[in-house]
UniProtKB/Swiss-Prot annotation:
GO biological process: regulation of transcription by RNA polymerase II
Keyword check for Nucleus: yes
Major site of localization recorded for this protein: nucleus
GO cellular component terms attached to this protein's record: mediator complex
Pfam families the record matches: Med4
Record's keyword terms, sorted: Activator, Coiled coil, Nucleus, Transcription, Transcription regulation
Gene, per the UniProt record: med4
The family this protein is said to belong to: Belongs to the Mediator complex subunit 4 family.
Organism domain of life: Eukaryota
Quaternary structure (record): Component of the Mediator complex.
PANTHER family referenced in this protein's UniProt entry, alphabetically: MEDIATOR OF RNA POLYMERASE II TRANSCRIPTION SUBUNIT 4 (PTHR13208:SF2)
Range of residues in the leader sequence: none
Protein name as it appears in the record: Mediator of RNA polymerase II transcription subunit 4
Length: 252
């Protein structure tokens, strides 16, 4: 089994011990020779030469230790750089994980959109059918009032003032209705007329129109017949349309 090589520190300590022993022997020998006045220069010279040799080896080992110290400092700098790079790699790995998650989500959404597109293509509706459907909506006055609509007309646009007062919102808000409290008598609704407090107060409305107003479920033709084709009613219609436009602009 190979003996492990000693470290530089152990070798330095060993040289220091040898130098200490040789120095002590040399000093003791010099002191003894001075007290006994014996001259034996041969042994002293051997110890001195051995001491000089050990000192030279010690100096060489010190140079090795200094070079190893520089290498150790460089290693510490490199270790710090490695730690920094490792932190950067971990951060980059985290960002890559987030990007992978985002891409996976985007791919999934893209696949779902492609499925929706394929489904839409399989069940596509022609433009002619859409135009026909739009024409039906427009013809039934579902999005706008009829061209002959005037204030007091029970047709669209909904809701009318009568419906607002008799509805749930009118009951909750407790709007002042001149003693009616938002409710209409059942016989008045059944007869298709308004109470006196809710009768139209505009000068351009005829008494026949206020007394013969029909609920929304009656036909519109009967109401137009009640207006009559005479000249006075035509003038009233013009005034009514003017007031309607002005009232709509004020409400906007």
């Amino acid at each position: 089994m190979a003996v492990p090589e000693k470290s530089t520190k152990e070798r330095l300590m060993s040289f220091l011990d040898d130098l200490e022993v040789l120095s002590r022997e040399l000093i003791e020998m010099l002191a003894l020779s001075r007290n006994q006045k014996l001259s034996q220069p041969g042994e002293e010279n051997q110890i001195l030469e051995l001491l000089i040799q050990k000192d030279g080896e010690f100096q060489e080992l010190m140079k090795v230790a200094l070079s190893q110290g520089k290498i150790h400092q460089e290693m510490q700098v490199l270790e710090k750089e490695v730690e920094k790079r490792d932190s950067d790699i971990q951060q980059l790995q985290k960002q890559l994980k987030e990007a992978e998650h985002i891409l996976a989500t985007a791919v999934y959404q893209a696949k779902e959109k492609l499925k929706s597109i394929d489904k839409a293509r399989k069940g596509a509706i022609s433009s002619e059918e859409l135009i026909k459907y739009a024409h039906r909506i427009s013809a039934s006055n579902a999005v706008c009032a009829p061209l002959t609509w005037v204030p007091g007309d029970p047709r669209r646009p909904y809701p009318t003032d009568l419906e607002m007062r008799s509805g749930l919102l009118g009951q909750m808000s407790n709007l002042p209705t001149n003693g009616v409290n938002g409710h209409l008598p059942g016989d008045a609704l059944a007869a298709g007329r308004l109470p006196d407090v809710l009768a139209p107060q505009y000068p351009w409305q005829s008494n026949d129109m206020s007394m013969n107003m029909l609920p929304p479920n009656h036909s519109n033709e009967f109401l137009m017949e009640s207006l009559g084709p005479n000249k006075e009613n035509e003038e009233d219609v013009e005034v009514m349309s003017t007031d309607s436009s002005s009232s709509s602009s004020d409400s906007d």
